[in-house]
Swiss-Prot record:
Swiss-Prot/TrEMBL keywords: Ribonucleoprotein, Ribosomal protein, RNA-binding, rRNA-binding
Protein name (record): Large ribosomal subunit protein uL6
Gene Ontology MF: a single term: rRNA binding
Gene name of the record: rplF
GO biological process, one term: cytoplasmic translation
Length: 179
């Protein structure tokens, strides 16, 4: 019984260069490059225009690593080819974002402004005063940067003010009942 996810081959799109040297996997594409160390007990090989992963044995930890390695490598191939992005929406009177160098300055109703500088490989764009786009090749880092920005002023349930993902629905609560 092998890992259902791990046994699926990863298609290599045109324009993506893949290298496997021992346990080191690297992918290079139009959007950038990324590398990953394949866990022990898992071997990766390029067959035609696909990457195939095989597990050394059928033990549960190996099966788990098999599926994990396949998912991470598939994400890397997609990331260097297409890239990943998350859009954040700023809701609230006077709340806005302004591009400042490579970073973004947020005005979120605090007594001070908050400046966010992106890590290496991540770009931040302000499409308008109320929308910020986080882009990069690494899915995990893009999601983490977006989550850190959202955390600056998480949406509150009464008026929905704060920073939310563009596709996120905020569960609203009724205010207190008056007499």
């Amino acid at each position: 019984m092998a890992s259902h996810i791990g046994k699926l081959p990863i298609a290599i799109p045109a324009g993506v260069e893949v290298k496997i040297e021992g346990q080191n996997f690297s992918a290079k594409g139009a959007k950038g490059s990324d590398s990953y160390v394949v866990p022990e007990g898992i071997t990766a090989a390029v067959e035609g225009n696909e990457i195939v992963l095989t597990a050394a044995d059928d033990l549960r930890p190996t099966r788990a690593k098999h599926g994990l390695a396949r998912s991470i490598m598939a994400g890397m191939v997609k990331g260097v080819h297409d890239g990943y992005s998350k859009t954040l929406e700023i809701v609230g009177t006077g709340y806005r974002a302004v591009a400042k160098g490579k970073g973004i300055e947020f005005f979120l109703g605090y007594s001070h402004t908050i400046t966010v500088n992106p890590p290496e490989g991540i770009t931040l764009k302000v499409t308008d005063a109320n929308h910020v786009v986080v882009e990069g090749t690494d899915k995990q880092v893009v999601g983490q940067v977006a989550a850190n920005i959202r955390k600056l002023r998480a949406p509150e349930p009464y008026k929905g003010k704060g920073i939310k993902y563009a596709d996120e629905r905020i569960l609203r609560k009724a205010g207190k009942a008056g007499k």
